[in-house]
Structure formats: structure tokens, C-alpha cells
């Protein structure tokens, strides 16, 4: 009677206990059967399972526990992310492929790394020796011996339970009893030390978040330093040439400016161009005035020649060269045929006159005239010829005759037709 009352009290206490949230991590080598085991626990068919890339998450209700299991990928490249899930896990489910004896050494090293981690040491671990349905699968004792499981567990002070199972034999309520038994044992151990584990998990999670924030800041600082170093190297490579190009090159202004500012800027540019044109014209006029001076017809003395300007000397030398060229041409013409003597004399006289003629340069013509604006293009049809229309024709005589109108028409002449009605007589 007393034991019955005690059992009733225990049941009442359990019924009043709140639902506890528990997080578990499922790890192991690739192709060990982790995803098939997780799906079988959740109630899904475990066949045709693809390799897990990253992780997958399943949620289930087991008694008074709301369990979340993180199924982590077992490839070599992805095992580095396992440590990110250790802080918030209450326990570990390690799945072993008992039919693959060649990878037992790799499994042993991986398990040792997991249990050695400070955020896993001391937490309960469930080892599932999977694929017992295959031939040549190792038994429970063989798996313990190959993994040196007893030594690892004692060294890291972890409670451990090993269960040989086969994840593909059933799912849901028909799941392998060994899997169900192992999961029940793991949750029972967690429930016995739930408060201590919760406190430890809270502490580890806070430390891990602080560490992640610090790593993020350090990463950002490294990126900033690398960027500054690249910019410094770029500026050093550019050197003074880059600075000179920046100074000499046009300054790129903002293309989106108010229209008033653009108009003022254009007016300033036009004024500068006009000033530049006027300065160029003045300089051209000065040069022409210095170059073009009235020349005297009579030859000057040698003293006057010495006192001439350099421009005048250039003109004289040019004149002499021209006269020599004309003389040489005359000599060539004289050596020609006799038939062209008259034409040669005429050309000779003309050339002699041209070579000995010295005319003063008109100063009025030297002054630059303002350029005449180009004529506007002719309108369309400007070049088409004018249409020459013929004069209006007039009648040769009078169009109206007074004696024509008002007279009756002449009678019609009735002529007998041959073979007519009048000739059809019967005698």
C-alpha cells in the first residue's frame, strides 16, 4: 500500500514537470547512416537518403522532452563545423559503420577529437554500431575494442552507452528497438543532471558567442589592414606621374548642375574665345605691318642695304632668286625650236618686265579684313530651272458670226435607198 502511494506521487510529480528542451548532435563519418537513423527516429522512411551537405535539423517529442537533433555532415571538409554546435548540445549521438572495418582507425581518431573538445568532455555519449544487417559487421565487443572506447570514455569522463542496430529495418513505431533504447538512456542521463548541464550550456554558449564576435572583429580588422596596404601600394606605384596626371588632367565636374550655372559657364567660355581671337588678329596685323613696307623703285646704295631690316633682306634675296630662275628659264627657251621664236620673245619680254618691275605694296590691302560670313545654303529647289510657259493662243478670226445664228436649218435630203420599202412592189 505504501509503495503504491509512492508510485502515485512520483507519477504526479512527473506529470507536473514542465517540458524540457534538449539539443543533441549526431556525428560520425560519411556513409555511416546518420541521416537514415535521424529519419527513422522522426518517423520517415530511411531509404534513398542523399549525403548531408552541411547539416539537417529534426524536432521530435519524447516523453517530457522537446528534442532537437542536428544531423551534421561527416565529410572531411565539413567536420570543421562540428565544434560550432558543441556548446548548446546536452549530449552526443555517434554513429559508427560496423560493416566497414577498414575505416575503424579513422573513426577512432574522429571520436577522440570529439571527446577531447572542452565543450563535449563530461557530457553523455550514445554510440550506435549501425549496419548490423550486413554480412561481416562487427559486434558490440569488437567495436569497443577497435575504437578503444573504454579508454576514451574514462579519459574524458563521459558516460557512454553502445547499441548495435540497423537503421534501415524500420522507422517510426517500428524503428529498431536498440535505437529506441539508446535514445531513452541518453535522455534519462540528461534528465538526472539537467540543471548542471543547462548551466554549463548557458555559460559555454555565452563564451562561444563572445569568441565569435571577437573573431568577426579580428577578421574585419585584417580585411581593413589589407585594404589599406593595397591602397598604399597602389599610390606608391602611381607615384609622381599619377599626381602629375591628376594636376594636368581636367577636373571632372558634376554633370548634374543647375541650368543657370551652365549658361554662365558657357558665356565665360565664349568671352575667352573672343578675347583670344582678337589677340591673335592684333598679333597678325603687327607682323604684317613689320613685314610689308613700301619698297623703292630705284636701287639703293650699299650703305642703305646694310641698314635694312632682316625682313627686307629676306625679300631682296627672294627677288634675286626669282630673277635668276626666270633667266634660266629664258635660256632654256632660246635653246628650243626656231618655230617658237616669236612666242619666246613675248614671254621673255613679259618675264623681263615682271622680273624688273617693283611695285609698292599697298598698305590698305595688308590690313586684315573681317572675314565675310559664309553664304547661307540655297533653299530647296533653288537650282531647278524655271518653267517657260507658252503664250496664250488667240483665235485667228472672229469666233462669232452674226449671220450664222438665228437661221433655220436646211431640210434633209431624202434619198431613195435601193431595196427599200418603196421599191418592194408586187406585180
Curated annotation (Swiss-Prot):
Residues 345-356 have a biased composition (Basic residues). One of its GO terms (molecular function) is GTPase activity. GTP binds at residues 28-35, 71-75, 130-133. InterPro entries: Ciliary_GTPase, P-loop_NTPase, Small_GTP-bd, Small_GTPase_ARF/SAR. Residues 194-285 form a coiled coil. It is a lipid-anchor. Residues 370-380 have a biased composition (Pro residues). Keywords: Cell membrane, Cell projection, Cilium, Coiled coil, Developmental protein, GTP-binding, Lipoprotein, Membrane, Nucleotide-binding, Palmitate, Phosphoprotein, Ubl conjugation. Sumoylation is required for PKD2 entry into cilium. Residues 207-235, 269-294, 310-319, 333-344, 391-404 have a biased composition (Basic and acidic residues). A lipid is attached at residues 8-9 (S-palmitoyl cysteine). One of its GO terms (biological process) is heart looping. Disruption phenotype: Impaired cilium's ability to convey critical extracellular signals such as Shh, without destroying cilia and their downstream pathways. Mice show a constitutive low-level of Shh activity owing to loss of modulation of Gli2 activator, corresponding to the specification of progenitors of motoneurons through most of the neural tube. In contrast to other mouse mutants that disrupt cilia, Gli3 repressor activity is unaffected in mutants. One of its GO terms (cellular component) is cilium. It is found in: Cell projection, Cilium membrane; Cell projection, Cilium. Gene3D superfamilies: P-loop containing nucleotide triphosphate hydrolases (3.40.50.300). Monomer. Interacts with IFT complex B components IFT46 and IFT74. Interacts with CIMAP3. Interacts with EXOC2; regulates ARL13B localization to the cilium membrane. Interacts with actin; the interaction mediates colocalization of ARL13B and microtubules. Belongs to the small GTPase superfamily. Arf family. Cilium-specific protein required to control the microtubule-based, ciliary axoneme structure. May act by maintaining the association between IFT subcomplexes A and B. Binds GTP but is not able to hydrolyze it; the GTPase activity remains unclear. Required to pattern the neural tube. Involved in cerebral cortex development: required for the initial formation of a polarized radial glial scaffold, the first step in the construction of the cerebral cortex, by regulating ciliary signaling. Regulates the migration and placement of postmitotic interneurons in the developing cerebral cortex. PANTHER family: ADP-RIBOSYLATION FACTOR-LIKE PROTEIN 13B. This is ADP-ribosylation factor-like protein 13B. The gene is Arl13b.
Amino acid at each position: 500500500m505504501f509503495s503504491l502511494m509512492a508510485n502515485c506521487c512520483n507519477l504526479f510529480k512527473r506529470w507536473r514537470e514542465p517540458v524540457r528542451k534538449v539539443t543533441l548532435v549526431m556525428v560520425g563519418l560519411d556513409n555511416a547512416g546518420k541521416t537514415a537513423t535521424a529519419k527513422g527516429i522522426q518517423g520517415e522512411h530511411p531509404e534513398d537518403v542523399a549525403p548531408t551537405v552541411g547539416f539537417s535539423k529534426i524536432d521530435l517529442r519524447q516523453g517530457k522532452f522537446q528534442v532537437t537533433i542536428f544531423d551534421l555532415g561527416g565529410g572531411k571538409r565539413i567536420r570543421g563545423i562540428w565544434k560550432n554546435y558543441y556548446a548548446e548540445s546536452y549530449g552526443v549521438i555517434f554513429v559508427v559503420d560496423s560493416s566497414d572495418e577498414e575505416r575503424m582507425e579513422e573513426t577512432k581518431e574522429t571520436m577522440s577529437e570529439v571527446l577531447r573538445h572542452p565543450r563535449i568532455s563530461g557530457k553523455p555519449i550514445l554510440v550506435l554500431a549501425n549496419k548490423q544487417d550486413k554480412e561481416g559487421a562487427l559486434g558490440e565487443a569488437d567495436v569497443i575494442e577497435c575504437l578503444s572506447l573504454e579508454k576514451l570514455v574514462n579519459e574524458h569522463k563521459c558516460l557512454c552507452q553502445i547499441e548495435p542496430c540497423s537503421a534501415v529495418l524500420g522507422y517510426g513505431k517500428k524503428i529498431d528497438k536498440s535505437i529506441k533504447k539508446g535514445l531513452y538512456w541518453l535522455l534519462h542521463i540528461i534528465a538526472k543532471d539537467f540543471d548542471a548541464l543547462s548551466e554549463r550550456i548557458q555559460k559555454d554558449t555565452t563564451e562561444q558567442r563572445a569568441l565569435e564576435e571577437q573573431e568577426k572583429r579580428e577578421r574585419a580588422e585584417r580585411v581593413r589592414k589589407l585594404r589599406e596596404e593595397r591602397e598604399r601600394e597602389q599610390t606608391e606605384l602611381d607615384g609622381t606621374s599619377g599626381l602629375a596626371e591628376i594636376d594636368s588632367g581636367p577636373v571632372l565636374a558634376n554633370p548634374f548642375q543647375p541650368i543657370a550655372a551652365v549658361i554662365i559657364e558657357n558665356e565665360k567660355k565664349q568671352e575667352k574665345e573672343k578675347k583670344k581671337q582678337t589677340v591673335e588678329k592684333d598679333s597678325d596685323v603687327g607682323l604684317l605691318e613689320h613685314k610689308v613696307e613700301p619698297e623703292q623703285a630705284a636701287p639703293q646704295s650699299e650703305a642703305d642695304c646694310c641698314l635694312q631690316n632682316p625682313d627686307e633682306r629676306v625679300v631682296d634675296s627672294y627677288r634675286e632668286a626669282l630673277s635668276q630662275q626666270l633667266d634660266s628659264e629664258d635660256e632654256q627657251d632660246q635653246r628650243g625650236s626656231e618655230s617658237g621664236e616669236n612666242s619666246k620673245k613675248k614671254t621673255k619680254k613679259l618675264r623681263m618686265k615682271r622680273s624688273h618691275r617693283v611695285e609698292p605694296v599697298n598698305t590698305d590691302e595688308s590690313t586684315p579684313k573681317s572675314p565675310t560670313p559664309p553664304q547661307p545654303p540655297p533653299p530647296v529647289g533653288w537650282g531647278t530651272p524655271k518653267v517657260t510657259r507658252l503664250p496664250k493662243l488667240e483665235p485667228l478670226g472672229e469666233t462669232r458670226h452674226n449671220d450664222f445664228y438665228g437661221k433655220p436649218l436646211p431640210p434633209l435630203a431624202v434619198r431613195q435607198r435601193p431595196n427599200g420599202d418603196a421599191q418592194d412592189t408586187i406585180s
